[in-house]
């Protein structure tokens, strides 16, 4: 059954990729880090993603402060899923540059993370994301550049 969180404007190729992730079929690194797009993504359309991360305090480094490395790791996943929503048949990508700007401590029970594909050329995607606190204030801004390549160029040959 099709995942209702994925919009009709997502290509069949991208939809298959998104459905795998949103079903919980995750790479080992996601499992080890506790990154769960299958539980947190609320909606995906071509070039847009909305997630709500349930902050239970387990990623805090101090009272009311989420570890910046966690923000970066989850951000890379969010902007990558957003980029994946705009792929066409046979395309893949890898992160070229990821920048995180923290404006205030990330705290609160539910953090909204929204990502947008701002520009896509044949070889590069540029994605931005906002982390918003429960009060609506901007906690972090994410900037990511993705190198778009044929899938076979990104697969390791043995």
Positions of PLM-derived features:
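Terminal targeting signals and extreme-terminal segments of soluble enzymes
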Residues: 1-158
């Amino acid at each position: 059954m099709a995942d209702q969180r994925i919009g009709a404007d997502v290509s069949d190729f991208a939809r298959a990729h998104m459905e795998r992730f949103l079903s919980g079929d995750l790479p080992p690194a996601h499992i080890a880090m506790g990154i769960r797009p299958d539980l947190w993504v609320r909606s995906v359309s071509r070039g847009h993603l909305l997630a709500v991360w349930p902050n239970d305090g387990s990623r805090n480094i101090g009272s009311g402060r989420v570890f910046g490395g966690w923000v970066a790791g989850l951000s890379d996943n969010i902007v990558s899923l957003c980029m994946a929503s705009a792929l066409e048949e046979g395309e893949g990508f890898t992160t070229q540059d990821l920048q995180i700007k923290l404006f205030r401590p990330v705290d609160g029970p539910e953090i909204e993370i929204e990502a947008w594909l701002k520009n896509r050329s044949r070889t590069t995607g540029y994605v931005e994301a906002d982390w918003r606190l429960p009060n609506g204030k901007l906690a972090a801004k994410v900037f990511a550049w993705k190198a778009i390549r044929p899938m076979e160029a990104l697969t390791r040959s043995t």
